[in-house]
Amino acid sequence: MTYKIVPTPKFAKNFKKLDPFVRKQIKSYLNRVTENPRAKGKALVANRTGQWRYRIGAYRVIVNIQDDELIILALEVGHRRDIY
């Protein structure tokens, strides 16, 4: 089963602001996790329960994995100092 990545408007806006090299790294990483999105991510806790984090160098991608629809909803992207 392959999941589909669906970016939110906030994710798309912040993604466009990133350096082209970083964008390429993030795209490549997200394409690799579509087969098994929980294998490399980490579940978040507290006020972000139900969301997952992917670590890509100094950047983080926050997602919500929807198993019933096979969707990875990309919520936020940014440098680790700014994302939480």
What are these regions (language model features)?
Residues 22, 26-33:
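Compact soluble domain cores
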